[in-house]
Swiss-Prot record:
The gene is Adat1. Keywords: Hydrolase, Metal-binding, Phosphoprotein, tRNA processing, Zinc. This is tRNA-specific adenosine deaminase 1. Its cofactor is 1D-myo-inositol hexakisphosphate. Residues 63-498 form the A to I editase domain. PANTHER family: TRNA-SPECIFIC ADENOSINE DEAMINASE 1 (PTHR46516:SF1). The active site is at E89 (proton donor).
Amino acid sequence: MWTADEIAQLCYAHYNVRLPKQGKPEPNREWTLLAAVVKIQASANQACDIPEKEVQVTKEVVSMGTGTKCIGQSKMRESGDILNDSHAEIIARRSFQRYLLHQLHLAAVLKEDSIFVPGTQRGLWRLRPDLSFVFFSSHTPCGDASIIPMLEFEEQPCCPVIRSWANNSPVQETENLEDSKDKRNCEDPASPVAKKMRLGTPARSLSNCVAHHGTQESGPVKPDVSSSDLTKEEPDAANGIASGSFRVVDVYRTGAKCVPGETGDLREPGAAYHQVGLLRVKPGRGDRTCSMSCSDKMARWNVLGCQGALLMHFLEKPIYLSAVVIGKCPYSQEAMRRALTGRCEETLVLPRGFGVQELEIQQSGLLFEQSRCAVHRKRGDSPGRLVPCGAAISWSAVPQQPLDVTANGFPQGTTKKEIGSPRARSRISKVELFRSFQKLLSSIADDEQPDSIRVTKKLDTYQEYKDAASAYQEAWGALRRIQPFASWIRNPPDYHQFK
């Protein structure tokens, strides 16, 4: 079928060949994050009895995004012409929506070959049965999936994170991290303390690299587990991992902050810093953001699909991801599963076509060459700070203007005087995707339009079109009735009233 390394290599090659120099990190000074959606197509005329692993497929990158930034709440605009969230995963998903709009235009308007085939109801389309989509990210999503234990070992290979840690509250900190000096040393990739630690990843040791730790302050809540000396009960012989005792000495931290008003992090030293399973918002520089963490958004996609409310008007079923592949980085299989699928497992009554997906989650052993870890290793003792790249790149598999490079939510190079004009809009901003949706709708004869639009009273604003996707809104309402999703931060209505 495909392997995690094949997906990663395809995305890295696409980044190097198809994306321009503009918007990429400055060598040896900046780093960025990468995400993409890969279309998987099973080859035709294969025997039905071929084992799944031997099925021949073609792989194609259909959307890609880079980026590390979010704007604060004070910079949000009611006109929908700014990107609030420019993390790579979100850029890739919005670029994917642009690709889906183009494919719907091919099918519904031009009657040309497309990823969609007619559905059973008038005006609706469904994904071809030989196609699926894999989501790739060079790193674990910010938020819950990035709360990963660091394990200290004596003379034993790298062990996977045990299920009990990943699914419950953090374990107690160990004595050697009580001292604040040692704690700071753990956050320094070059320190002796940090080099003693190895991540609990199933088969691979990640050396000389630690995740970027958050800067949240500590708070006085005790952890649930009374001892940091744990015994691995599930040795993974297939990966050559021996059983034995180990200690969780700290956690890789996420900068994403808990939703205001909800139970917060423990904030104790070492491994007791974070609570797991909570909704989080992305951090801002002094100005709080309204953007939920990538872990939370990806969990939502796994129930509602990646297409969003607008495109659901044209679809018989949501467009789900079949798998998520993560590049080489601090990683925990159990934390990923908890964050993306485990929090949605409570029984949900969902509309027809919607459901909690059994998402396949894998990690590649290939490191993204412009990741923070790779650039830090390459630059050695070079002077100056290593900083995240301020630009974001969007690429979609569409024939016209596939590239979009932004900074601070606007096309790179936009002047203050230009803000508010059409030229100052990203092609994947809310207002531009809405324009593409309206163009698609106006190109379809009235008697061929979907019932959700045809029989509804006159629709005008972005919010009205979203609300008219009744099945999608019903599914979203069902998800928000369970914890932790009841705490989801929603933008005020004024931000969705543009036309």
